[in-house]
From Swiss-Prot:
The chain crosses the membrane at residues 22-42, 44-64, 97-117, 140-160, 163-183, 207-227, 259-279, 319-339, 366-386, 389-409, 423-443. One of its GO terms (molecular function) is threonine efflux transmembrane transporter activity. The lineage of its organism: Bacteria, Pseudomonadati, Pseudomonadota, Gammaproteobacteria, Enterobacterales. It comes from Salmonella paratyphi B (strain ATCC BAA-1250 / SPB7). This is Threonine/serine transporter TdcC. Its main location: membrane. InterPro entries: Amino_acid_transport_2, Hydroxy_aa_transpt, Thr/Ser_transpt_TdcC. PANTHER family: SERINE TRANSPORTER (PTHR35334), THREONINE_SERINE TRANSPORTER TDCC (PTHR35334:SF1).
Length: 443
């Protein structure tokens, strides 16, 4: 075979798309599609049609460029099997490892609190509106739900991991089906309210502020950062030895791009379908009630006057049940991450990494009591979920997803080739705008 034929053959082999690439594309997509998606239509539709159209333009760049930046950081380590903690320690020493451990824990723990509030509110609105039962004490409901989940976690963690993996695709399918099912109920209210002569760019309800706050919920909803490290390790072990690191980086970027396109298509279609069914005023009402959009849709169909169709009745009950299942799924997934992160912090600082000095069973019990106790306090206090996302969840995710990779690109020699690129400015800007939400919420 000639040299030219060898090159062509090699390029053809390199350009092939493997089954494992499809698996990871769907895996990244499935990781991002969780209960957080149920709040995106509320924030996106809060300001009406023009802000959500601008968010549509920003959605793919935010999802793709931010996750690609994190993947590049994970790829920069010398050990193909090294995770993100090892890579950060390689670049910045033990201090960097401590920082990444803290970031991971505090990126996940507030999400658990958010889901604690959400599942309490979702169950209570389902109990009162769909089942027509008398109102229950909030503290009791939150305690009952958390104890139920603690019981399941304690005695059936392995089973729950399997169940969660099976629930990903039915949940995504149900979102698409609900989006399609809402089409007969679409109305022109959101279009009728567009008045180009009275559009305000600035101010509390201006387009710029609405889109700015929307960026936070996009960072929160379009987030598969917890699985990026495992994804990169898998691809490096599969491709790097045979094709080199540059090809592996391109392959990772290609997979992240396809996963981002799938994610944006499903979530934005769901958001637009909800907005055309409801109205900006309804979205504001959902925010005030502190419930996910599926619960609000269920109540919306419950309040329809006259004889309801079987279709509307199915939507009323189906939306609530899907919301509950989605939140349970997300809660269990984030609980396992929070438990691992808290145990890691205790081991690192309390026992200096020596696992022989502590019983893991005892450590898991203490961590569970702290996690469930703090979640119950937050669930009972019932802070506004969107405010909690914008002030805590999204900024911490942005620190890990956007700013940490950008800092590494400036400081780490192995990432020097990525310096001076325009997409770095975009990722940095998204990270800073998300973190600045904290200042906006304070003042």
């Amino acid at each position: 075979m000639s040299t030219t034929d060898s090159i062509v053959s090699s390029q053809a082999k390199q350009s092939s798309w493997r089954k494992s690439d499809t698996t990871w594309t769907l895996g990244l997509f499935g990781t991002a599609i969780g209960a957080g998606v149920l709040f995106f239509p509320i924030r996106a539709g809060f300001g009406g049609l023009i802000p959500i159209l601008l968010m549509l333009v920003l959605a793919y760049p935010i999802a793709f460029y931010c996750h690609r930046a994190l993947a590049r950081l994970c790829l920069s380590g010398s050990n193909p099997s090294g995770n993100i903690t090892e890579t950060v320690e390689e670049h910045f020493g033990k201090t960097g490892g401590v920082v990444i451990t803290f970031l991971y824990f505090f990126a996940i723990c507030p999400l658990l609190w958010i889901y604690g509030v959400t599942i309490t509110n979702t169950f209570m609105t389902f109990w009162e509106n769909q089942l027509q039962m008398p109102a229950l004490n909030r503290g009791f409901v939150a305690l009952f739900l958390l104890l139920l989940m603690a019981f399941v976690i304690w005695f059936g963690k392995d089973l729950m991991v399997k169940v969660m993996s099976y629930l990903v695709w039915p949940f995504i399918a149900s979102l698409v089906l609900i989006s399609l099912s809402l089409i007969p109920y679409w109305n022109s209210a959101v279009i009728d309210q567009v008045d180009l002569s009275n559009i305000a760019l600035t101010g509390h309800d201006g387009i710029l502020v609405t889109v700015w706050l929307g960026i936070s919920i996009m960072v929160f909803s379009f987030n598969f950062s917890p699985i990026v490290s495992s994804f990169v390790v898998s691809k490096r072990e599969e491709y790097e030895k045979e094709f080199g690191r540059e090809f592996t980086e391109r392959k990772c970027s290609q997979i992240i791009s396809r996963a981002s396109m799938l994610m944006v298509a499903v979530v934005m279609f769901f958001a637009f379908s909800c907005l055309f069914t409801l109205s900006p005023q309804n979205m504001a009402d959902a925010k005030a009630q502190n419930i996910p959009v599926l619960s609000y849709l269920a109540n919306h169909f419950a309040s329809l006057s006259g004889t309801k169709s079987t279709f509307a009745t199915v939507l009323e009950y189906g939306a609530s049940i899907i919301a509950l299942v989605a939140i349970f799924k997300s809660f269990f997934g984030h609980y396992l991450g929070t438990l691992e992160g808290l145990n890691g912090l205790v081991m690192k600082f309390g026992y200096k990494g020596d696992k022989t000095k502590v019983s893991m069973g005892k450590l898991n019990t203490i961590s569970m009591i702290f996690i469930m106790g703090s979640t119950w306090v937050v669930a009972y206090a019932n802070p506004n979920i969107l405010d909690l996302i914008e002030a805590m969840g999204a900024p911490i995710i942005a620190s890990l997803l956007c700013l940490l990779p950008m800092y590494a690109i400036r400081k780490a020699p192995s990432l020097a080739k990525y310096r001076g690129r325009l997409d770095n400015v975009f990722v940095t800007l998204i990270g800073l705008l998300t973190i600045l939400n904290i200042v906006y919420k304070l003042f």
